Every structure is written in structure tokens, then in C-alpha cells.
Amino acid sequence: MIDRQRMGLWALAILTLPMYLTVTEGSKSSWGLENEALIVRCPQRGRSTYPVEWYYSDTNESIPTQKRNRIFVSRDRLKFLPARVEDSGIYACVIRSPNLNKTGYLNVTIHKKPPSCNIPDYLMYSTVRGSDKNFKITCPTIDLYNWTAPVQWFKNCKALQEPRFRAHRSYLFIDNVTHDDEGDYTCQFTHAENGTNYIVTATRSFTVEEKGFSMFPVITNPPYNHTMEVEIGKPASIACSACFGKGSHFLADVLWQINKTVVGNFGEARIQEEEGRNESSSNDMDCLTSVLRITGVTEKDLSLEYDCLALNLHGMIRHTIRLRRKQPIDHRSIYYIVAGCSLLLMFINVLVIVLKVFWIEVALFWRDIVTPYKTRNDGKLYDAYIIYPRVFRGSAAGTHSVEYFVHHTLPDVLENKCGYKLCIYGRDLLPGQDAATVVESSIQNSRRQVFVLAPHMMHSKEFAYEQEIALHSALIQNNSKVILIEMEPLGEASRLQVGDLQDSLQHLVKIQGTIKWREDHVADKQSLSSKFWKHVRYQMPVPERASKTASVAAPLSGKACLDLKHF
């Protein structure tokens, strides 16, 4: 009797247990941004139509349903209008049915808005990947809200304005998708509740995936009918690489054969084949590589054929290579090449040094060889106009040496020996002409302006006028070049003071320097091989090599310079 009563009690308990059983399962995480609307759904909702109750998990306090509260329950949804950072926590939802209670937990985290455009990963929804030419992105969680169009879209925090971006309902359509369209896309919409509008934003990444394709195998290595050099007794490695398209490939493989026999059946332990490994080529093609390794090359290996095979569902391709003995390096030839290059480099360095030291001599020699009879059609009458300080009453003794240098030394060398035409003030006289006009015309018709600089030159008014005209022609009009000859006296006290010269003349002295004439330094004052005359000839134009008679007579002709005694 007692056993029957116990059995009845157990049966009653088993029958009534489902009425009071509560199933605790299901948990989910959700997040939102501060001062935005956040609506979450009970994880245990499913298709149930039974009422849902929400609780604060830490206090078991029931969350009200009145809409006047900032946090309230609406059917199976929990609304935060707006959400705040202190709302973060775990919330429990209970679905009560006549036979079973289901409890779910929701971990809600409210974050502050990022100060910059860089959105952290924990605020990103699932990444969207697309490969179609035209693609659409869905705004996440928008179906939970009471929103009205339009939805605003942003890419990397910048509003989308191009016509190929089209917003329709909760979607963003992108036409002609390219890799430039990859990035973070944010949708922004408005949730309306009790006459108040709340902003909601959601961000997800978009990446472009190109569609894969399969093609006939293409062997990229080794080349067709290639011959590889190896050393006897040394190890050797040969790679067989082939590309099959993009994406996953079914039944694609690369392998080696030796004399039309697979490596595993060839029977040589020295020769092993590594399994194919996946690689990507420079154009993003999917490729496979298999490496044939020979631990020690023998003479027998040189007579074998090695086939690189690539095959897939499209077909098979084969590249055959052979091995040959590597020729030893001819060290003697290398020594000869290194020695020859070293000698050539030394010769070039010596040549550069010689040219730098003897550049003027080389240039003068080149003139004599290459242009011995050069003619000019520039319309100039003279090769040089000589500008020098005149003799006047009370002049220093050095003035007379300048006069002798200008009227005797210069013509003897430059006119009689070199064939130049000089225009020298005071050498010839054509009366009845205006002095200033004739000086200016003579300077304009000269290819060089030779300044003879002396310590007493500042006392010569004629020198100052000619200097002005000549510098204007050389520096302003770029009509001629200037040669500066400095007369060095024997005493140190009467040297030329450059600071006393005109600014333009000081500039020329600083830039190109002067050619110094000192009588005690020159043994043969008219020798063309002296350093002074080499420098003068180098700066003079290339002379016309007319007959010596013509060269001497030229200064005495009607085109010679004028005697401007009363300048």
C-alpha cells in the first residue's frame, strides 16, 4: 500500500513538473553609442507569442513598460532612449508560457562616441564581402527601430555623393564596384518614439572579392626546353611552378617525372620531390610549386630528362629540362679583366689630372691643330680693344712702363706673332672725328676688352670713360668678353688696391681674376711659351690665320684705332 502511494506521488510530481519548470539558456551581447537610441531583443524570443518580462540581472528588479521611462520594455524588446554609459550591464528576459519558462541574458555595453574617424573593431558589425559588379550593403539592426527614410550613408566618415552610390530603404547600392570602394560604411537614421527623434548609427566594413576562375595550366618555371648548369657532387634544386587561375581549384597539381617515370617510382634515394605548396604570382594568380631536390649530382644525372608537369580539369602541360656540367670559372680571364679595368681607371685619372694642370696648353694646341684658318662673320673689326691709363703731366713713373707695354710689347706678340688685330688708343690718328663716338664705336667693334690695371689708373679720366663703355658692352649688352691684365710693380707699397676699383670691375676681378705682368718674372718678355702669354692667348678669341704681312699692316690701315689726344 505504501509503495503504491509513493509511486502515485512520483507520478504526480512528474506530471506537474513541466508547469513550473524554467529553462535557463541563451545569452547574447549587444552594444550601442552614448546619447543614441538602442533597442535590443530577447535572445529567447524565437517565434513565441507569449509575454516577455525584463529584469536587471544584478538586482532582479523588473523593468517597467511605461514609455515615460528612459529605459522601458515594449513586448519582447528593451529600449534605451537614449542610452548612457552607466546603462552597461547584464539584462535578463523571461518568456512565460503555461508549461515552460525560458530565460535569456543580454550583455549590453554602451560606449562613448569615438573622438576621431577611426572606428574600433568592437563597434563594427559583421563585414560584408562582395564580388558582383553591382552590390548592396544593408544597414544593420535597422529593423528593430521605428525609422523613416531617408537613411544617410558615409564612407570613412565622408558623406557619399557620387551618383553610383544609391540609398534605397535600408540598403546602399554601389554600381561598378572596384577595390577603391573598400572601407568602413556607416548608416545613420532617426528613430521616432513618443514624439521625440533619436539618432542611431551603425558601421560595417565592405571588402571586394573577385570571382575566381579556372584556366588551362601555365608553367612559369622552368622555361620550356631549359638547360640547367650543375656541379658534380653538389646538391641541386629545381622548382616546378604553374598557375591555374584564381580561387579554389579542384584536381590541380604539379609534379616531376624523370624519364617519364614519377619520382617515387624512379628508385633513386638521392632524388626527392617536395609536396606542392600554394603560392601567389605578381598578378594574384593562384599557383602551385613542387621542388625536385638532388642531394649529390652524378654523371648519370646529366643524361636524364626531367619533366615538370602541371594538370587540372582543363588539361596537362609539360616542360622538359636537362642538366649539364657547369663550366669552371676561368680565373686567369678574370684577372686580365680586373687588371685591364684598373689600368683604364688609372689612365683616366692621370688624364684628368694632366688636363687639369695643362688645360691651357691643351686648349692652345687644339686651336692650332683643329682651327688653323678659322674665319669669322660676326662683323667685328678688332680682336681686342686695349684700355689703359694715359700719360699726363705729373704722372707716376710706372705710367711710362704701362705705355711701353701697351704700344710695344702687346702689338709685338699679339699682332706680329699671333695674327690678332688690336685697337690701341693713341697709336694712329684720324682727325676730324668726335672722340667719344669713335671710342664707343671701336669698343663695340671689338671681340675682347683688355683692361690694363695699374696702381695709378684712378687718376686717368680717359680710362674711366673707356672703362664705363667697355663694362656696359661686356656685362649689360653681353657683346664681348673682358681680359684683366694687372701691372705688378716691384715695390709692395704701390700695389693695386682692388677696393678702389669700380664695383663692376671689382666683381670681374673677384670672379675671373687677373693675369699678372711683372717684368722681373719674365726672362723673355715676348716668348709665347711663357705663362703670361699662354693665359692671354687662352682668353683671346681664335685668331684668323692670314698672312703675316696682312697681320702687321692691319693696325696701320684705315680701320685702326684713333689718336684721341684731346679726349
Curated annotation (Swiss-Prot):
Signal sequence, start to end: 1-26
Expressing tissues: Predominantly expressed in hematopoietic tissues, and in macrophage, erythroid, epithelial and fibroblast cell lines. Isoform A is expressed in brain astrocytes and microglia. Isoform B is expressed in brain endothelial cells.
Cellular compartments annotated: Cell membrane
Post-translational modification: Phosphorylated by GSK3B at Ser-442; leading to proteasomal degradation. Ubiquitinated at Lys-326 in a FBXL19-mediated manner; leading to proteasomal degradation. Ubiquitination by TRAF6 via 'Lys-27'-linked polyubiquitination and deubiquitination by USP38 serves as a critical regulatory mechanism for fine-tuning IL1RL1-mediated inflammatory response.
Membrane topology according to the record: Single-pass type I membrane protein
Residues in the Cytoplasmic compartment per record: 356-567
Alphabetical UniProt keywords: Cell membrane, Disulfide bond, Glycoprotein, Hydrolase, Immunoglobulin domain, Isopeptide bond, Membrane, NAD, Phosphoprotein, Receptor, Repeat, Secreted, Signal, Transmembrane, Transmembrane helix, Ubl conjugation
Disulfide pattern: C42-C93, C117-C157, C139-C187, C240-C308, C243-C287
Chain residue numbers at which the record places covalent cross-link Glycyl lysine isopeptide (Lys-Gly) (interchain with G-Cter in ubiquitin): K326
Subunit structure: Interacts with MYD88, IRAK1, IRAK4, and TRAF6. Bound to its ligand IL33, interacts with IL1RAP to form the minimal interleukin-33 signaling complex with a 1:1:1 stoichiometry. Interacts with KIT (bound to KITLG/SCF). A mast cell-specific KITLG/SCF-induced interleukin-33 signaling complex contains IL1RL1, IL1RAP, KIT and MYD88. Interacts with TMED1.
Protein's name in the database: Interleukin-1 receptor-like 1
Organism: Mus musculus (Mouse)
Classification lineage: Eukaryota, Metazoa, Chordata, Craniata, Vertebrata
